[in-house]
Amino acid sequence: MKPPQYRQVPAQVDLPALEHAVLDFWREQKIFAKSLEQSEGRPEWVFYEGPPTANGMPGAHHIEARVFKDVFPRFRTMRGYHVARKAGWDCHGLPVELAVEKELGFSGKQDIEAYGIAEFNAKCRESVTRHTDAFEELTSRMGYWTDLNDPYRTMDPEYIESVWWSLKEIFNKGLLVQDYRVAPWCPQDETGLSDHELAQGYETIVDPSVYVRFPLTSGPLAGRAALLVWTTTPWTLVSNTAVAAHPDVTYVVATNGEEKLVVAEPLVEKALGEGWETTGETFTGAEMERWTYQRPFELVEFPAPAHYVVNAEYVTTEDGTGLVHQSPAFGEDDLKVCREYGLPVVNPVRTNGTFEEDVPLVGGVFFKKADEKLTEDLQNRGLLFKHIPYEHSYPHCWRCHTALLYYAQPSWYIRTTAVKDRLLQENEKTNWFPESVKHGRFGDWLNNNVDWALSRSRFWGTPLPLWTCEEGHLTCVGSRAELSELTGTDQSNLDPHRPFIDAVTFACPQDGCGRTATRVPEVIDAWYDSGSMPFAQWGYPYKNKELFESRYPAQFISEAIDQTRGWFYTLMAVGTLVFDKSSYENVVCLGHILAEDGRKMSKHLGNILQPIPLMDQHGADAVRWFMAAGGSPWAARRVGHGTIQEVVRKTLLTYWNTVAFQALYARTSGWAPSEADPAPADRPVLDRWLLSELHALTDQVTQALESYDTQRAGKLLSAFVDDLSNWYVRRSRRRFWQGDKAALRTLHEVVETVTRLMAPLTPFITERVWQDLVFPVTPGAPESVHLASWPEADLSAIDPELSKQMVLVRRLVELGRATRAESGVKTRQPLSRALVAVAGFETLDRELHAQITEELNVTSLAALSEVGGSLVDTTAKANFRALGKRFGKGVQAVAKAVAGADAAALSLALREGTASVEVDGETVTLAPDEVIITETPREGWSVASDSGATVALDLEITEELRQAGLARDAIRLIQEARKNSGLDVADRIALRWTSTDPEVIAALSEHSELIADEVLATDFAQGEADDTYGEPFTDESLSLTFRLRKA
């Protein structure tokens, strides 16, 4: 029976092609389904998918959250959990309606109503599934495993019934109420917005800032002074109802000799400017209460007396004049104050943002555009004191970007303020990544919580399940079954959307009323839909009761940082309102993805990266790695072809090249893992070091992912892969050529473990490596890396002392390379010796000495102390930057002591740790970074020192060393020729060479056995080659010509 063998691994890899092959493998072998089946019965680890809306095409930013929503479920599955992954679609809401309105060429609600609500909603239903194929393609292509065959949809009747049930629960708690309040209103869409929607749409604009005279008509100043009032919304002056003054603020009369104006005392100079003096007359706001004034416009009628000074605690003296114009139809504080005084609420602006047609001057004008006409009229009538452009942040609709107005009208609210303390308590239990969000962005949001404006005067959404009769009785319905009982007809197949639900009436069931109850016309905020997904995705409580209860709350959710005002908030709010418990325990907030130029991706800038072409150019693994580990996930990051290609070059290709190297030499030598391989304890020190580092890596990566830190996990893995390739493999290359079982077994174990560790981050390339290097040679191995378990770190196998020694070895090698480069002696030229001075060298494992001598290409290695005399002239001076922090003004005295000390003794002491000097009779201890040591090599030596370590190279090159150097030059040339001839690395060759340089002839003759061994030559001889040999290779610097052929 043929022994197991690695599959052949190509040296060059086409990552996108590899990934498409892996996708085929997953699909054909149903690997995702098997991962779910395999983990059935294990502890649940619950993840919720935040539903996207598929009425638009996905962009590169959609990849980001999906990466995190795939990495952690894969990781937890490998850790022994069952992780169900149910996809979902967000179907309702204003964004969908706006897109359909645009398609149909509509300009507002009146067009929709004329077209027909049923027809319009049918178009909405069609639009939200229009691009599901594109989202599913993205999901599949990037390797995001989620169940697309059974997704939840917020528009499905069963989902809506669950939402109704939750609203009835809230209603029964007295927390779903109707109130007349001022709330954000979009005049384009003619609907209200919730506070969390409002937070998503601020834009910087310039508004007119006007100071207006309100002549007093009663009180001690009547007829001889005016109140000076400041506002940035001149259009609201049409419905001015009162002027608010703080009861405890002192207001003064100021004059310029021509008129008198009343302003708050602290604001005289700021509001009036130069040339104004106070008259000495002062009044508190309380004393001014009910002074009447002439209103700025008489364009609308008032049904009751108004236009006098009222007192309000919210008035400040930070800006303006300390007197605040009140228009209760357009301001929350205004409405509250005016209600206390019984003042009327007059609203001349229609729901589309235009003034009523019969309003003089501005009838039919959009509220923002009315400012100019009104300001001009105030100017003409002598009421405008001054007009200054004012730049500020103003709320706009987060979808259509229309300027919002605050609008008083009856709406339905969820009293989230009643559960504010519970929300704060649940937030304390939640783990936020980054942690700063808990008490920062999200905590502030909860602390400033306002009631949730739930109702929307729109069409495509979950209908508000409230029916009311003429007597004002309210009935909240929780299901279609309940509706069937109330109507006495079967409503089980009813489409619960408008307009069908609007036609359902029943006899009011309350107190024997019996009057006809009709549904209120509103739908609900679509954010409530998505916030209900933990239970509504299962149709709870009408089915899947046990399933939901086993999967609530989620252990993990992840979306972009702006969802602190969106889904993160609504999930916590709905969960707390309905179940008295937040819907999640751990949440990863992600920064936004920017274009490579640092700007936001947008169509008009032409900098959008299409996700599928991006992955088909660089590979999904590279994009995933960048999203997960290319910088802090919670900071805004720039993504482009350059950043993705860097991931390919630095990490993925390094990993692949190591795998290809292992496969090549294992196949060449016919090796496969077996019990006959040397045990770890019997392997060379370099192998033992690598295995120790592997177990440390496994422990650290596990901790990082347990802490939701993909950046740290990625950094650890990338650094390890680099060390693996550029230190271990490079230092062990000769052993692999020789088929060394210890080296092959060690690298196999490392590749298998690293492949498992990388699998959640880069599922494609690791799958291919598993199929090529693990599955074929490992009896009982799972058929996919994603069916494998997570590696367990053996902490007892970690050797901190060996790790410390290898750090020292590599540090000395780095110093040796640096001093050789500075000397100009090329690396291939052997030198006789290197001398080392550093703490810990004496205890260094003798095997590690060989690593240093081979790397530095020296014959011997010894401690500098073993050689008599010094190889350098040493000077020492104070590092003022470091010492200044410790000694301040006393640094000069320390510097003088350092300059006067024995520099060589200081250098020696600092290598061991610290040094000391006498300063004004006291001993001062100095650290290595506080003294600058300069060592000038003696002639014939090259010396490099850094932080207490010194490496010296003896530069004397004997004839024997020179010949060895020439031999190494020849080896390099022949190896290049082998590569260019298309030979396999294991192919044996025959070679003939000639040279006109006596030194070269002597060198190649003396070292012929070494050269032949290095270049795999079975026949290496001086002389002319016959026609069976290939084309000649010539190197003029060596006066060397050679020809080779396969042996």
Curated annotation (Swiss-Prot):
The gene is ileS. Catalyzes the attachment of isoleucine to tRNA(Ile). As IleRS can inadvertently accommodate and process structurally similar amino acids such as valine, to avoid such errors it has two additional distinct tRNA(Ile)-dependent editing activities. One activity is designated as 'pretransfer' editing and involves the hydrolysis of activated Val-AMP. The other activity is designated 'posttransfer' editing and involves deacylation of mischarged Val-tRNA(Ile). Keywords: Aminoacyl-tRNA synthetase, ATP-binding, Cytoplasm, Ligase, Metal-binding, Nucleotide-binding, Protein biosynthesis, Zinc. Monomer. Transmembrane segments: none annotated. It is found in: Cytoplasm. GO terms for molecular function: aminoacyl-tRNA deacylase activity; ATP binding; isoleucine-tRNA ligase activity; tRNA binding; zinc ion binding. One of its GO terms (cellular component) is cytoplasm. This is Isoleucine--tRNA ligase. Belongs to the class-I aminoacyl-tRNA synthetase family. IleS type 2 subfamily. InterPro entries: aa-tRNA-synth_Ia, Anticodon_Ile_ABEc, Ile-tRNA-ligase, Ile-tRNA-ligase_type2, M/V/L/I-tRNA-synth_anticd-bd, Rossmann-like_a/b/a_fold, tRNAsynth_Ia_anticodon-bd, Val/Leu/Ile-tRNA-synth_edit. IleRS has two distinct active sites: one for aminoacylation and one for editing. The misactivated valine is translocated from the active site to the editing site, which sterically excludes the correctly activated isoleucine. The single editing site contains two valyl binding pockets, one specific for each substrate (Val-AMP or Val-tRNA(Ile)). Pfam families: Anticodon_1, DUF5915, tRNA-synt_1. PANTHER family: ISOLEUCINE--TRNA LIGASE, CYTOPLASMIC, SOLEUCYL-TRNA SYNTHETASE. ATP binds at residue 603. Its cofactor is Zn(2+). It comes from the Bacteria. GO terms for biological process: isoleucyl-tRNA aminoacylation. It catalyses: tRNA(Ile) + L-isoleucine + ATP = L-isoleucyl-tRNA(Ile) + AMP + diphosphate. A motif ('HIGH' region) lies at residues 52-62. A motif ('KMSKS' region) lies at residues 600-604. Its EC number is 6.1.1.5.
